[in-house]
């Protein structure tokens, strides 16, 4: 995972900060803002070098009115077709009335997407006055930023592909529909024929969800959706799909769209993802969700945004109420924690089945890498080979470290001369490590040392176009090579070692921002074969292979389809519980890295006991003496009486002991028993979080594992820098004073880095005596970064402030509850 401060435009967040201080209330609501008003910028502290994308001033407005999912839940899950169509129409009408009332008050809103099935909300491009009015208005749960989601795959091509080995005897997923929320699918692929419907295009206006070509390069077709479809239902001769009898409903929510560089990149906006989830639960769009897909796969990730209250998280919960299980990729940003991790959205939703990646290949290749600078040894260790070609003999190379980000093959050249020829190219892996390594190879490098992103062993070894060794090195080693260009890099001949299931080094860790365990489980996600045909180096036919948490999520989505056929009475909530509860722990990695462990479909299919919820989230614990209580409903889905023994697996000296209402339960067939679980903090601990696993073992049956977690500390100092460009100024909309706020934190830890976000940030105005005048702005679900906005000298109501002294206060609330951090700064209006 790459952690650095980047410069990126996120006008939405800035506008949320500037909204009420730039333009008086009552203006024309949806007109584009003037770009000369003031600073509008966001600079994040976390993230991989993905394509920079501006979302404009798009926001998601979540309303308090009932959605279809709310109505169905209130009816106990029982509703007729006519009921559901009526409720959807009522939700749309209530939304229309709300927008109409705003228009009559002079705030015109033109929604881009309207959501009524999974939640009641709409997205729109809003100006400052509209955001101000909505934040203050009853009937609005909140105004949230529209963010960007990217395919969670490390791209690879032909060589060494293998299958995940997930099967159920006599079960193929027949009769089960999987909604694939991704790029378009290449419907011409022969090994997908008969398994993929025409689908729905959310991004464009096509009649189906076919894969689109890059507007500036027709040869570059969207591939990610095709690869995911192949993993689930493909019928290739080398590696078949997990659920070959299932049907894919492709919903194109991502694709080639304009980026900030003036080029095109493949991505989705979160409002497009929401629109796709709306169609997943109501494919024909008639307002009745009885035709909902059983499974919705989201192999895209909104980086680091593991918020439990976001519109996307709410929509995933709504989809579950409508009986659609959402399977989501955890992310490819590597280890993090020990409390909050690197999991993205929508995987952070409490109702999503978040999936991490495991490397399940039988063997990998290691090489010894030694880096020397004079008499100093900077690195001496066995390193997994990531590239296609192992060295045939020991290579002695000088490093060539690139100081600037790599964006194309030209990055390796200076005025036509290669910067890396005959050397070991030291370069950031970027969003696509395989492509970066290929560019270095074309520039004549003899080896590639990738940093800033952990690459799974052999993960790009499937790319035959890379004819040199590719290794992943620590950031510290890369920085040392930047300082010492005369160092010597030695790469020894390889040796092959047998593999056991190991968590892929790129797979994101939790916890989510509500303290929930994420990912819930792991699945094979490295080097899996797809239906992408190609040619190997010897000219023989080969098939593409992909790696990433999206790959693992596709495997689990296929497994869920098999389970849905095998257990047709299981609803979405039960499917999730069966898959999570039956997994197998691997290695010694913490619960936050693997949840319950590696997918075991056979155990899930034969389970006699279902635990709801399958994950226990205690949230944030208080001080000494804190106690948290949760209840687990245990349902006997077998035909026999079950005697169940419950174990906490804890030692006696645990700092956060977990106690149970019963250690032994007897449950009749079809009956439900409740198990009380209490966690308490008995002494001060330095740890950021505590976690563990409950084990429920029926006599003569398969055990069920339930992970739990408690976040032990409330983060402090959520507001860092608070600066004002001018402390004395006249009111001006054209030349405002610039306020810069640094919100949230990124803390280095032994696990990697911990992302500490802000649930809500308020900007308030007070007079010279400290009396609160009112709220100027509110930003929700704030990721760590710098937020800049203009202070025009107008108050909360839009009126020009009188001459005098004022105080600007910034309050930032932590996720999971707690006391806000407050910083203030004084200024004077003259």
Identify the role of each PLM range.
Residues 32-152:
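Inhibitory N-terminal propeptides of secreted protease zymogens
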Residues 33-53, 111-114, 123-135, 151-180, ...:
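N-terminal domain-start motif of subtilase-like serine proteases
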Residues 38, 291-295, 352-354, 466-483, ...:
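C-terminal subdomain of the subtilisin-like protease fold in secreted/lumenal serine endopeptidases
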Residues 54, 71-73, 136, 166-200, ...:
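Subtilisin-like serine protease catalytic core
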Residues 197-199, 203-211, 219, 429-430, ...:
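Catalytic-core environment of secreted peptidases
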Residues 235, 253-480, 513-516, 536-553:
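Substrate-binding/access-modulating region of protease and related hydrolase catalytic domains
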Residues 502-507, 601-638, 660-664, 679-684, ...:
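Beta-sheet-dominated interaction scaffolds and their linkers
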Residues 588-591, 602-616, 638-678, 720, ...:
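Surface-exposed binding patches on compact interaction domains or structured appendages
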């Amino acid at each position: 995972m790459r952690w650095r401060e980047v410069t990126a435009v996120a006008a939405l967040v800035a506008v949320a900060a500037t909204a009420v201080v730039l333009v008086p209330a009552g203006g024309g609501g949806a007109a584009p803002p003037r770009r000369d008003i003031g600073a509008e910028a966001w600079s994040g502290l976390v993230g991989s070098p993905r394509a920079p994308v501006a979302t404009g001033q798009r926001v998601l407005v979540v309303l308090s009115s009932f959605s279809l999912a709310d109505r169905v839940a209130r009816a106990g899950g029982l509703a007729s077709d006519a009921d559901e169509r009526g409720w959807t129409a009522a939700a749309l009408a209530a939304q229309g009335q709300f927008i109409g009332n705003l228009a009559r008050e002079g705030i015109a809103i033109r929604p881009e997407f309207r959501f009524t099935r999974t939640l009641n909300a709409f997205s729109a491009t809003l100006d400052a006055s509209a955001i101000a009015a909505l934040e203050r208005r009853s009937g609005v749960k909140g105004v949230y930023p529209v963010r960007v989601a990217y395919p969670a795959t490390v791209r690879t091509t032909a060589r060494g592909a293998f299958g995940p080995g997930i099967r159920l005897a006599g079960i193929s997923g027949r009769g089960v529909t999987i909604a694939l929320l991704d790029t378009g699918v290449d419907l011409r692929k022969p090994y997908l024929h008969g398994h993929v419907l025409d689908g729905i295009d959310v991004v464009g206006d096509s009649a189906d969800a076919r894969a689109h070509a890059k507007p500036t390069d027709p040869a570059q077709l969207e591939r990610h959706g095709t690869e995911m479809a192949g993993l689930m239902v493909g019928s290739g001769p080398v590696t078949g799909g997990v659920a070959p009898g299932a049907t894919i409903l492709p919903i194109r929510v991502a694709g080639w769209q304009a980026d900030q560089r003036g080029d095109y990149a493949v991505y989705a906006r979160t409002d497009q993802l929401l629109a796709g989830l709306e169609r997943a639960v109501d494919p024909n769009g008639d307002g009745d969700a009885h035709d909902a897909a059983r499974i919705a796969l989201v192999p895209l990730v909104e980086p680091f945004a593991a918020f439990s209250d976001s519109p996307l998280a709410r929509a995933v919960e709504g989809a579950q109420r409508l009986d659609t299980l959402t399977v989501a990729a955890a992310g490819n940003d590597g280890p993090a924690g020990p409390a909050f991790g690197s999991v993205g959205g929508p995987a952070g939703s409490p109702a999503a089945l978040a999936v991490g990646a495991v490397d399940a290949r039988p063997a990998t290749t290691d090489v010894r890498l030694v880096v020397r600078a004079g008499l100093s040894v900077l690195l001496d260790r066995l390193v997994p080979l990531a590239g296609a070609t192992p060295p045939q003999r020991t290579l002695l190379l000088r490093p060539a470290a690139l100081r600037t980000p790599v964006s194309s093959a030209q990055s390796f050249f200076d005025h036509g001369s290669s910067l890396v020829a005959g050397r070991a190219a030291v370069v950031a892996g970027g969003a696509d490590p395989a492509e970066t390594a290929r560019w270095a190879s074309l520039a004549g490098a003899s080896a590639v040392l990738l940093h800033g992103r952990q690459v799974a062993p052999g993960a790009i070894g499937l790319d035959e176009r890379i004819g040199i060794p590719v290794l992943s090195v620590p950031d510290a080693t890369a920085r040392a090579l930047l300082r010492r260009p005369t160092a010597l890099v030695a790469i020894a001949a390889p040796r092959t070692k047998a593999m056991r299931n190991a968590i892929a080094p790129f797979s994101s860790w939790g916890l989510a921002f509500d303290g929930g365990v994420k990912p819930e489980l792991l699945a094979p996600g490295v080097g899996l074969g797809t239906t992408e045909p190609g040619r190997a180096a010897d000219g023989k036919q080969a098939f593409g292979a992909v790696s990433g948490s999206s790959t693992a999520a596709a495997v689990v989505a296929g497994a869920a389809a098999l389970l849905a056929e095998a257990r047709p009475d299981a609803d979405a909530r039960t499917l999730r519980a069966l898959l999570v509860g039956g997994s197998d722990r691997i290695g010694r990695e913490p619960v936050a890295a693997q949840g319950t462990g590696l997918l075991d479909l056979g155990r899930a299919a034969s389970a006699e006991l279902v635990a709801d919820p399958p994950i226990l989230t205690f949230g944030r614990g208080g001080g000494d003496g804190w106690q948290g209580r949760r209840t687990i409903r245990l349902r006997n889905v077998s035909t026999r009486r079950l005697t169940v023994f419950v174990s906490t697996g804890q030692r006696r000296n645990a700092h956060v002991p977990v106690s149970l209402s019963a250690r032994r339960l007897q449950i009749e067939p079809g009956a439900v028993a409740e198990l009380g679980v209490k966690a308490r903090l008995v002494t001060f601990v330095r740890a950021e979080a505590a976690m563990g696993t409950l084990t429920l073992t029926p006599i003569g049956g398969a055990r069920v594992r339930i992970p739990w977690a408690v976040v032990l500390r409330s983060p402090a100092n959520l507001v860092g820098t608070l600066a004002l460009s001018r402390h004395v100024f006249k009111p001006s909309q054209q030349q405002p004073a610039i306020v810069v706020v640094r919100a949230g934190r990124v803390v280095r830890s032994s696990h990697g880095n911990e992302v500490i976000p802000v649930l809500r940030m308020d900007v308030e105005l007070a007079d010279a005596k400290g009396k609160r005048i009112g709220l100027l702005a509110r930003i929700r679900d704030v990721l760590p970064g710098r937020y800049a906005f203009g202070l025009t000298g107008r108050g909360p109501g839009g009126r020009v402030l009188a001459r005098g002294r004022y105080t600007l206060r910034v309050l930032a609330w932590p996720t999971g509850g707690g006391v806000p951090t407050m910083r203030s700064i004084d200024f004077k209006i003259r």
